[in-house]
């Protein structure tokens, strides 16, 4: 077994040696941090949970009091980070802290700090004692080095059993008291404030008598309020932001498009259709100047009728000596230009004639000016920049005003004097269409610019306000942002499909080439019928033995690390599996003269398999649990594990490690099938599909866990009875199998559960449609949760949920890998697997999790294991799930394309970064342990204590936890893996295919998607807090998860906004182009993906069906799910006979831990052998059971 070194454990001599080579500041920091894990410290406590965090807190306080530098949370090396319970690897560190450590391959002594050792210079006698303690009495370097317990610790262990019950009761009372005085959290306070209008007595009247129900309802309203606020913000950003910052733009009329009902004065248009002019020379009383006079003024510019004089132009424009323009005592002029109108297009020539009298039509009187200023303008006249470049006019811009420099020609040189710069501007053709604001910034030039704006302004330039510009910027940034996400997801999905996915899959299987059209057609035909068996397997691919030609040049030196596996320069990388690291004599060998076909033996070719008793030499390796030297005293050579009592006579022999039928080393795989209430036909086809996979049956075994004694609706037999009929050649007759206890994932008395273990080989049935020559002999183990005797008369005895079934296997694998105390059930599981496979359980590296209603394509298992072996960083993966009942109803039709897009776009995109956020529980694979460093070093992944502990959480007291653990446990397992191992990968393997049946009734679909959507929201809330995922800032998986979370909660609002935009674009003008283009890209790119990846045009039709059903997917289902946030039932997904609506979280009574026996495997096995020798009839443990302790002492 791979046993990592204890972190944080350093010998005193190593500390003293390193101290002379390092600065004092660094030495002081390290001594402080290392003292946290020093077992000789007076603060050392047997409960590791409180030891680390509390002791480090005391150290920080002491250093602060002494005036030292307080330890900061930032810029701390990972190995010095604080190991508090919130750390992702906290439990793993606690488990490995006091584990036995093997002699490293470097030749140096392990750094083990013995308890009670004085920090003094060693003597030869002490060195010899230390060596004996480390390497054993006989100096066997292959034996593990265990800590020798002190007398004080031995006394504590002896007395711990007597006070365990009393301590447990006291701890329970203390926790209950703490819960009563626990201050409310910020979230609880917010939910209480937001639901102040619904006091508890009102909620009791509406069917919420329990406090937990009312609390869940308040949390639901709190979440809905946040969703509404996010939706309101998105709506404001979409529709209200522009109206707020830009405001309602004033009415503006474009030059040369102003009708005859208007006149223009100083760049503004006035509607004079209903106006009348008083009597004047040449103008009758009550006359409309637009139509009633001989000269029609409609559409003309009358700025010279009401000239702005004596303003900024005073001093610049003056009266000549012989001028007829009247002035006052201040020298103010009455007018500058002749009082005539001109065409708005600037085509009028200067007119200096005078009608009736001097100053006629100049409106210099106060009453005339007052009447003009009282008029309300209809809008500004605006010019575009293209209009200012018109060659027929000489237009320029100053401070947003359009100046017609041709109007300077209307000056009468005999009447007024004006600056020569006016003439220079008039005669300069280079300033046409130029903004002159910069040139008229200071001094006299600035006054000239203002003067020109008052006398020759003909309009304004077409510009937006700052608010409008800001709204446009926000619009385009949002557009670019959304388009970037959509296009990048599309491009990366294609990148994964074309270039990355083929690297993971096996190059060739029994079904032919991976990318062959024939295989794709076989998959489509196979997936159209749920009960259709897989295609007939072709002849096995010829085995491949890797070339081991030695290199002439050396590949290592004295400086090479012994932990590094050399690849020999540019040679093919050496993939590592458990079998490839162990000698072939340690496994069940094939008979002499056998061919690779023996590793796929069928039931026709049963015969005696020779078993070598010497294959499990304890001193040969340190990889396997049962081969460890610790068991040499328990299992003597005369009764080796290979005896008839341990290994089934029909066990499938193990091939040599270098046999590679598919181009990669074979890894041992468990195929976990969880059953609840499925019928015989469904379970039969599922197990047939797994047993018939082309992966060698020497490296796969089927583990079926039945979740209680359940009878499906309309079934004749219960599910366990159906499954037991599918096993042959059991090691123990089914009627003689006993039930054993284990700790279930439940509360109250249900935490104690019992199960039976059956081990044998898969039976294809008497009337199987599978040809006999194709029936492989596959090891099989069945675990039936039958419940305690107290629940024998209950409706569903033993039922604890799917998560409990998964934890049975996960906890078993953890205890096997860490050699922890196990329950009686786990001991029977260990022996059962060993009986039917001939290999110890810790040889298994991966586990395939399949639902009982899911059928696997024959070469899917091969492709999945290929990805695991080729990339040790992959810790989880999933394949594509196809729908078998596509055309059963309109409900199934709308799901076809949704399944396709979720795999080939969403999961393919996430696979590029190795962060698939959801590995579906119906068809996924997890890595049990991964190779780390050099030879025979492995680290737990799925068997990691942090994964098992958090996934087996039984205190589910908040809405968030209930949605994670009761509704979406499969997705939460993926979340836990990413949260604990953010640097490892979870990917999608499109070559691995399965099929399943989806809901064909809308109410069932509604119930299923309610669970999935709520689970998605809460799992994304967990993942968005993981900071160590791939990438940084906007280019990171964390940001992608945040966008996905926001996109999920605003789905109802988004589809509502989309429908509004489409309808408004049809019935209103102008058409909103940008939102429509964006909508077309979002909905159209998946269609391109279909054509590129699916190679079947029929999926385009499925896409159209999906688009029609978008209101259901994006509005009906999410809205229903959000309103049902506090509903934790499974609804109508699967019914059983006589089922009552009661969840797995309901628990009554008290948990009695004394009913569960927990011991290490070697202790169980020693007692068993003692009973066999003495003929005793005692319990399995051989003596009264040991109380269950959740935190064992090492």
UniProtKB/Swiss-Prot annotation:
It is an enzyme of class 2 (transferase). InterPro entries: Chitin_synth, CHS4-like_dom, Nucleotide-diphossugar_trans. GO terms for cellular component: cell periphery; cell septum; cellular bud neck; chitosome; incipient cellular bud site; plasma membrane; prospore membrane. Residues 42-54, 150-164 have a biased composition (Basic residues). The keyword Cell wall biogenesis/degradation applies. It comes from the Eukaryota. Glycans are attached at residues 351, 390, 582, 608, 885, 1014. Coiled coil: none annotated. GO terms for molecular function: chitin synthase activity. Pfam families: Chitin_synth_2, CHS4. Disruption phenotype: Leads to reduced chitin content and vegetative cell lysis. Results in a remarkable decrease in the efficiency of conidia formation, when chsA is also deleted. CDD domains: Chitin_synth_C. Residues 1-91, 136-177 are annotated as: Disordered. The keyword Membrane applies. Its EC number is 2.4.1.16. It catalyses: [(1->4)-N-acetyl-beta-D-glucosaminyl](n) + UDP-N-acetyl-alpha-D-glucosamine = [(1->4)-N-acetyl-beta-D-glucosaminyl](n+1) + UDP + H(+). Polymerizes chitin, a structural polymer of the cell wall and septum, by transferring the sugar moiety of UDP-GlcNAc to the non-reducing end of the growing chitin polymer. Responsible for synthesis of 30-40% of the chitin in the cells. ChsA and chsD play redundant functions in conidia formation. The chitin synthesized by the chsD-encoded isozyme contributes to the rigidity of the walls of germinating conidia, of the subapical region of hyphae, and of conidiophore vesicles, but is not necessary for normal morphology of these cells. This is Chitin synthase C. It comes from Emericella nidulans (strain FGSC A4 / ATCC 38163 / CBS 112.46 / NRRL 194 / M139) (Aspergillus nidulans). The gene is chsD.
